[in-house]
Each structure stands twice: as structure tokens, then as C-alpha cells.
Amino acid sequence: MRLKRAGVPAEHRAARTKPEIALAEIDRVIASGVRFGCVLADSGYGSSGPFRQALSERGLLWAVGLSQRQNVYPADIALIFPIAKTGKPRKYHIPDQSPVSAEALLAEGKWQRVSWRRGTKGRLTCLFTARRVRVADGHKHRMLNNRMQCMPGDEVWLVGERRSTGEQKYYVSNLPADATIKTLAATIKARWVCEQAHQQLKEELGLDHFEGRSWTGLHRHALMTMIAYAFLQSRRLKAAGRKKKNRRTATTTKHAGHQASDPRPLRTTSTPTMSSL
């Protein structure tokens, strides 16, 4: 009754999980012709095996957060057919190794400092390690010790990030097996832009300030904040473009003045690209 009073359409009244809502939105934007390179999400979505599998079934690349407690198998895991000592012969294969948590598997990994882009205060760097694994997100099967255990899924990248604060984050991605650690890090950290946008929508433009009780009112409020954000973003990009143009003009003028007074060639230097949301 409350949903009806709020004007919620009948097709949106059924309860849905966050991954289900996300998949519906992904299908919607794909159908509208939007192109994107990779689906990024935090562990609230990434820890869902059905969500990751649904992305793969759609032929999408993804890099998502993962709980440190998620069980994984090494990529070289083999499925064996155990011989039952008593009783009926076993019908299904089982892994020849037990799964371990993502945290435990990467604990002894080779961590290396990776720089993925330039920020306002210099290069952004962090410690990363990566290993090919198979996440324990397949169907559940009863093992020899009578314990239920998830079977290994598809082979993917398991990535660990160790921040300067000591905090560690874990991610999983279906990027190609020949992807470099820098590519993995840059792809994972690209989600920072989305997080910044969401934070600014809430803190600067009041996305979370709506106090109404109607479906239409909520959507109008969200639409207006997004229009305002799009306008501000266009102004930022124009300002960034002008600054880059001014730097190029100043560099060209400096080169011309140098060459007029000194016949020796001036060594050119690359101008870093300004990052913007």
C-alpha cells in the first residue's frame, strides 16, 4: 500500500538485490548504445558470484572488489575422480586441493610498487600483487569428509593492493591472462573517478538531501542533481582544455625565442596530461 501511495510503478515494486539492479541498468545502457570498456564495482557487488558470472555471460570485461575471506583455488587446480573405499562409486570429480582465502593466497606473493597515473600531487603509486586463480563460486559439492564445498569457477586474476596506511584490498578481474600488473592496477583504480563523482553529487549538489516520499519526486531530484553535475563537469573539462592549450602556446613561444637566439636545438619535454573527473 505504501508503494502505491508513493507512486512506485507496479513493475518496480518487487524486491531486488543490488547486483540485480546493477545488471538491469547495464542491460539498459547497452541497449541504448552506450559503449564502455570495463565494468567496475566494489566488493558489495564483486563478492556476488552470480553477478560476476552474469557479466561474463554478457561478454563484458570486469574488475570488481572481493572480500578477503572469499575462497579461491590456484589456477592449476585439477579435478580428480576419487575412488570410494566403501559404498557406491562417486559420480562427480572433486578438486585435488582445498581452497584458501584470497588474503592467505596472496600473503606470500611478490608485492611491487606500481604507478598507474599522475595526480595533482605527482604520480599515484601503491603496492600490488596479482595471481591467476579460480574463485570457489561454482556449484556446491559434498567432499570425502562429508563437508560441502564450492567447486572452482573460471580462471581469473586475483589482485591485492597494499596501501600506505597498511590497509589491504582485494579484487578479481577477467582481464586477459597476459595483462600486466600495471594494466590491472590502472583498471581497478579507475573506479576512483566514479567514487569522486558520487561523493560530489551528494556533498556538493545534495543528491542525498531529498526528503520527499514520492517516486516521481525522487527521480526528478536525482535528475536535476545529475544535470547540475554534467554542467559543472563540462566547465571543468573546458577549463582543463584551456590550461593545456595555454601551456602548449607558452612552450611553443619559448622554443621560438630560444631558437632565435641560439641555433642549437632545444630538447623537447613531454607535457603531462591533466586529469579531471
Show which residues each predicted segment covers.
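Short, hydrophobic/amphipathic alpha-helical patches that form generic packing surfaces
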Residues: 222-235, 274
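An anionic, glycine-rich sequence signature occurring as long contiguous blocks
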Residues: 1-15, 65-68, 72-193, 267, ...
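Conserved nucleotidyltransferase catalytic core and NTase-mimicking acidic/glycine-rich helix/loop elements
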Residues: 232-267
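Short, well-ordered loop/turn and helix-capping segments at boundaries between secondary-structure elements
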Residues: 177, 190, 194, 199, ...
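Short, conserved catalytic/metal-binding motifs centered on acidic residues
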Residues: 39-45, 62, 171, 192-201, ...
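Short, solvent-exposed helix-loop connector elements
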Residues: 50, 96, 173, 180-188, ...
